[in-house]
């Protein structure tokens, strides 16, 4: 069977390996997953209780207006319901953005290394990709590329903080850059990890209400998969001016998010004890990863997320990843990004100690 030719130029996104699969494949009893930046404390207790109470409604289609979650988000971010769209993960809203702006005659701009789905979705539209030479968000390079190809570039991605590297621009740096962007070019600020960055440094904090008030061409993305521990329910959102949201709705299928996901997201936003514990654990444990890196002369980039990336000169990241798998520890090998590096999710103290113990042996 023949398929559309553009599929020949697409590669599959490589998600983190599954715990059950690794346990069976490697014959290990205990598996620790530090690969997909999931919440190490699991699902918020209030969300669990909400799911229990609503489990008998799984046969019902969701409220397609999503009014309860939209109103909760609108109150949190001081925006209107018409400024919000809910997606099956923020990935789906990224897809809306790309399909609304890109085609085979234009292009988009991103950092040298950033979230892989931007390029995967854009290639489905035949759009050209411009990347900075620097792997991180070097705004001088962004400006130079944008000015050179201004007529062609219709979409810019700023991943703040950046996945899979962890660095983050100050909010003021991002807004200053956006001022130089044409109003017909959509700037997507992927803030999937911004709660972590804001906790560590208030200068990284992004306010959607201020962004969309100042700029008509900005889309702010948020997710419930990281801080809020709902990755398995697939729910995220976008915040932008009403014209952008209205355009996205023409691409959205009805009932794109389950009723259980919608309910759980509202409950998760009300579980402050859970999110505070998550943030405090993350950055206290992050210090141990920095100490480990220093001890073993491993290069790192200061991370504003719930993960840290280790860069290697002589050791091979694929070999290291395989050896960790044999010990029942799943991390993310970044070879597919062209890096000799691994990304490690910050886990619980027990999970992290297990990683340090086993990785120390591997590095000897």
Swiss-Prot record:
Protein name per Swiss-Prot or TrEMBL: Histidinol-phosphate aminotransferase
Pathway connected to this protein: Amino-acid biosynthesis; L-histidine biosynthesis; L-histidine from 5-phospho-alpha-D-ribose 1-diphosphate: step 7/9
Protein keywords: Amino-acid biosynthesis, Aminotransferase, Histidine biosynthesis, Pyridoxal phosphate, Transferase
The species this protein was found in: Campylobacter jejuni subsp. jejuni serotype O:2 (strain ATCC 700819 / NCTC 11168)
Signal peptide (UniProt feature, chain positions): none
Cofactor: pyridoxal 5'-phosphate
Domain of life where this protein originates: Bacteria
GO molecular function: histidinol-phosphate transaminase activity; pyridoxal phosphate binding
The protein's Enzyme Commission number: 2.6.1.9
Family, as annotated: Belongs to the class-II pyridoxal-phosphate-dependent aminotransferase family. Histidinol-phosphate aminotransferase subfamily.
GO biological process: L-histidine biosynthetic process
């Amino acid at each position: 069977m023949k398929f559309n030719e553009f599929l020949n130029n697409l590669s599959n996104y490589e998600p983190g390996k599954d715990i059950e699969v690794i346990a069976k494949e490697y014959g290990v009893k205990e598996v620790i997953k530090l690969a997909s930046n999931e919440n190490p404390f699991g699902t918020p207790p209030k969300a669990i209780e909400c799911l229990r109470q609503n489990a008998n409604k799984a046969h019902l289609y969701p409220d397609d207006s999503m009014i309860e979650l939209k109103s909760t988000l609108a109150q949190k971010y001081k925006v209107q319901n018409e400024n919000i769209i809910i997606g099956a993960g923020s990935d789906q809203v990224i897809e809306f953005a790309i399909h609304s702006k890109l085609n085979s005659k234009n292009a988009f701009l991103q950092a040298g290394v950033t979230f892989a789905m931007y390029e995967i979705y854009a290639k489905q539209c035949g759009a050209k990709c411009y990347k900075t030479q620097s792997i991180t968000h070097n705004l001088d390079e962004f400006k130079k590329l944008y000015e050179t190809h201004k007529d062609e570039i219709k979409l810019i991605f700023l991943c703040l903080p950046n996945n899979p590297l962890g660095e983050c621009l100050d909010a003021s740096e991002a807004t200053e850059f956006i001022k130089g962007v044409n109003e017909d070019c959509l700037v997507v600020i992927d803030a999937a990890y911004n709660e972590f960055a804001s906790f560590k440094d208030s200068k990284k904090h992004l306010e959607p209400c201020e962004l969309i008030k100042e700029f008509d061409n900005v889309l702010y993305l948020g997710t419930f998969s990281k801080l809020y521990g709902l990755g398995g329910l697939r729910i995220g959102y976008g915040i932008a001016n009403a014209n952008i949201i209205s355009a996205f709705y023409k691409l959205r299928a009805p009932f794109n998010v389950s009723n259980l996901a919608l309910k759980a997201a509202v409950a998760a936003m009300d579980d402050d004890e859970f999110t505070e514990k998550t943030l405090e654990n993350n950055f206290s444990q992050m210090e141990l990863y920095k100490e480990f890196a220093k001890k073993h002369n491993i290069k790192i980039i200061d991370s504003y997320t719930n993960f840290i990336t280790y860069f290697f000169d002589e050791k091979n990241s694929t070999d290291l990843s395989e050896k960790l798998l044999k010990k029942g520890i799943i991390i993310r090998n970044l070879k597919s990004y062209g890096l000799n590096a691994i990304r490690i999710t910050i886990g619980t103290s027990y999970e992290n100690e297990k990683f340090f113990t086993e990785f120390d042996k591997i590095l000897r």
